[in-house]
Structures are given as C-alpha cells and as structure tokens.
Amino acid sequence: MTTTVEQTAESHVFEADVARLLHMMVHSVYSDKGVFLRELISNGADACEKLRYEAIETPSLLAADAESRIMLRLDEESRQLVVEDNGIGMRRDEMIEALGTIARSGTRAFMERIAENKAAEGAQFIGQFGVGFYSCFMVAEHVDVISRRAGSEEAWKWSSDGKGSYSVEAANLVEAPARGTRIVLHLMEDAKTYTSRWTVERIVKEQSGHVPVAIRIVDKPGGEPVQITDGTALWTKSKSEVSKEDYTDFYRGLSGQYDEPALTVHFRAEGRHEYTALAFVPGTQPFDMFDPERKGRMKLYVKRVFITDDAELMPRYLRFVRGLIDTADLPLNVSREMIQESPILAAIRKGVTNRVITAIEKLADGESETYLTFWKNFGPVLKEGIYEDYERRAQLMALARFHTSASPEGHRSLAEYVKDAKEGQDAIYYLAGGSLDQLKASPQLEGFRARGIEVLLLTDSVDSFWVVNAPEFEGKAFKSITQGTADLAQFPRLDNQTPPEQDSAGLATFIGFAREKLAGQVADVRASDRLTESAVCLVAPEDGYDRQMEKILQNAGRLQGATKPILEINLAHPVIKAIAAVEDDASYQEDATFLLLDQARILDGERPQDPRKFAQRLARVFERSVRSEG
C-alpha cells in the first residue's frame, strides 16, 4: 500500500453565497458560538449511520472496526480541537461537493433569515439551514478536513482559512484515519476555551447527549480516551426514563433547530406491527415549510439502523413534524420502492399520523394560547389536509382557526362560527383574498357586516381549494360572498334600514343603460343587497369560480381566459343616484358607467382594463363637474 502521495494541492474558490456566509461566520457576534460543536458532532453521527446502512450490503466496509464512535481530541498548547468519526468518509468529489458548494438554497435562505433577526439569536438557525459545517469558522482561524471513504485506498485533505478559497490534495495514508473523517480546528486566540475538557464536555452533554453514537474525549496529547456519552438511542427508552430536557436536546440535534418543541409524541406500538415513534412539532416555523417539494422530515430506522429520511412517513400536510420511526418489521435491505409500496409501512404511517393529530387535538382543547401559536406557525400547512385527506377531514376542520369579520384579530373555530350563526342561516360565509387588511376593507363584506352575519376571512392560498372540496361543516355548506347572489333579504339590517326600490328615480333605467354599455366586459349589471357603503363591487357568476380562486388559477396558467364578472350597484349610494339622474348627457353617463366598473376592479385588487381610457374618462368627468359647478 502506498503511504505517501505526491500531488499538488488544488485551489478552489468558494461559491459567492458560501463566501458571503463564511464572512458572516468569521465576523460573527453570536452569543453561543459553541453551537459549532453540536453541528460537527451531528455530521459525524450522520456519517456513522450512513456507514451502518451501506454495510448491510457490503459488510467488509466495517472491517474489524464495527463500533461507531466520535472522538474529540484537545490540545491546549497548540490551540487545536479535533473532531473525528469512523463513519462513511468522503471521496475527493464528495469532499468538494460537501464542503465547497451548497447545491440547495440553504445558504441564501440562511443569510436572509439572519438579516431579519438579531445576531445573538442567529445561532438557532445554523443547523436548520444545512450550513452547519461552516459554523466552525466562528472559532477557527484555519480548518483542515482529512477524510477516507470506507473501503477506499485513498485519503483526501481539505483546507481553508474561511476567506474565500480552499484547497484539496491527496493525504498521507499513514496520517489519515483508517476510515471516516477528521476535522482539525486551529482555534482563534479568543476561542482557546474550546480546548478545555470542562467546556467541551458541558457542551456535548447539553447539546449532543443523545446522539446515537458514543462520544469519547482525549483531553491532552497522549491522554486516554474517556467516554462521555454512550450512544444509547433515546427513543428506545420508556417515556418515564426521559426528561423534558432530554427530549429537547434530542429534538435539537435531530432537527437542526434551536427552539423547544411545542409537542412531543413518543410511543411504542405493539400488536400486528411493532414500532417506536418519536415525533416533535417545532416551536417555531421551519424555514423549508413551504418548499415546493413539500418533503417530510421524518427518519426511518430498522432495528436502530438508519435507512432513509426521504420516505413519506407522514402526510405532506404534516411535513413540519420532525422525528423518527424505528421498526423491526421491515428488512434491513428494504429498497426505496419497497418503502413506498409496503403495506406494513402504510399501516405504521397511519398509526403515527393518528397519534400526532390526536396530540394536536389535545393541545387545541387545553392550552389556548399555546395552540394559537401552533396554528399561526403551521395552520396554513395543516389546512392542506382538509383538501387532501378525506379520512381525517372532519378532525382537521375542527382544528382550524380563522380570522373573521366579527373577530378580525382573533381566531375562531368553525364550531364557534356555527354556534353563533344567525337563525335561518344555512351557509358558512367566507371571503378569500391576499391579505387581511384587503379583506376587511372589501365592499362585498358590507352587507353581511350590516346584518351582523359573520364571514370567515381567508388569506392562505390553500383556502380557496379546501372550501370547495369540503362540502359542509355540521350541516352548513361553505359559500363565497364574492360568488352568486347574496340572498340577504331574509336577514334584517342592524340599523333597520330597508334597501331602496329599483325603479325609484330612474334607477332601473340606469341599470339597463349600464348593462348595455358594459355587455362586452361583464356578464350582468344588477342591484346589490350586499353593498351598504361602496357604490359598486364585482362578484362571480353562480356557476363560475370564486373571484379569488379564478385569480389563483389564472396566475398559475391553469385557466384559459377569465369568466365575465357581474357588476353589482348600490342603489342607495349618492354617486349612483347622481349618475342615474343625468339622463340628458349620455356621453357623461357612459364615461361614469365605465369608471364605476374600473372602480370595482380597483376595489377588487385589480387594475383598470385600459389605463389610458380610464384616465381620459376621469378627465372628462372632472371637466364636466367643474363646468357644472361654475
């Protein structure tokens, strides 16, 4: 075997985003720089788990060293901290990919998130964004990574000072680990404390105490290794043996987040299928929750051997849940295809999903403030289940909380809405749009507010889909207040006013005039019982899409041409009465009619169809008004 290698080191420049990230790390003012150690240990544990998995097919990879471990070596005099694992290791190309580039958007997302938060709070985001390795530059002025892939006859060395470039060269096999990765941190002067056994051991026990790989420490050159954690898998213990702090530490190491879990679900199922599940609902919203791929973050283990974190172990609407499932009912060499098609795993998935939803239901029934925080974080995703999961739709609808016209700043349940509904009200009314402020100012809401009828205010994109897919709740159908007729005549207004008759003061004639002039742009012009303050509004035909749904489909390119809306007119509005009364100036009345349509479009969040004509008509109407006043 060749023990020395003569090869010139290759110099590489970091990607622009990585270079910016490194600059941020080097000049970091994070209050908890010790987070770097948790990240390096977590990476080492992942490498050991990957080796155990590959060794199922290729046992020779383990050779005579089957026990996974992470070794920490301290050298106070040289100001060095070494983190070494005997995991899978890296080839040259893997080293460049893992340490020199970031293929996903984690780097940019991380930096954007940091820009929005105080520096002292930033450490909690490091692992969450997949950039954990770079955190070592918070404490190191230079970093060497020597790695040897299991089963390989080559070893490689990566080096960088974190200032924009790195080098890769072949490593001397005598000095390289027999297998795995050794990270040598040449610490900054003010980071010398990380060569203290007391400091390092405290950090490990606080932040990595439940990593499923034994961790040992050598506190000085030539010293004997001392085990500081035993690598016992926390999920194999009974709940009575695990403290809240233990769960929190494990959750942080597993998820890469630095908050506390809002919910912890830990149980062992026995019977037809035996498995252990440990699932956490995060206390804060993960950055990747709205990733278009909607991938879950649950890990699958078979007999404590990590298999994959890429299986759909939970419904996609629960993708914010972090955790793992460990079962002995699957073979260790289970393939990706077998995982997706396995009836055993389907049964396990169902059982775990039911337990998580039950835990969320208990949270909703008991701790109102805690649940509202949960809902603000995860409600938009959980509502996807109302659309997708027919079996659990009723449960998920009961969990949903909404802003409403009666409680715009609070959160109401559908059960509360139904309980407080007006006598004779057979629908749950809703208004969907882009923002809460826009919805609260919507003209379509006026008639309902005037009659004390509560309306759900829906601002999430998924809302427009599930309200169509969910036929009813407790016998009441969902009805958009921007579609079809309002049918409000049966409900008296709170001020006891009655709407004007259509034929009064020539209003019927004006409606006919407007219907004729706007025939190319609207399906109809009609009197409105939903307007009390605004002059006009747009609504969708009864057999068409809701106004918001139509916009969503158009923006997604899934709708070929929009349907014509209906223009509703408030016959009691002074502007409408004034326009209708000008029967001797058809040109003015026509301009005013088109301006009313453009006004309705603007109120609906749109632009005038023809801005140039809009401006010309507005100028002519202003001119006539000035002349008539003169």
Curated annotation (Swiss-Prot):
Residues 337-551 are annotated as: B. Residues 552-630 are annotated as: C. Molecular chaperone. Has ATPase activity. This is Chaperone protein HtpG. GO terms for cellular component: cytoplasm. Belongs to the heat shock protein 90 family. It comes from the Bacteria. It comes from Rhizobium etli (strain ATCC 51251 / DSM 11541 / JCM 21823 / NBRC 15573 / CFN 42). Keywords: ATP-binding, Chaperone, Cytoplasm, Nucleotide-binding, Plasmid, Stress response. The gene is htpG.
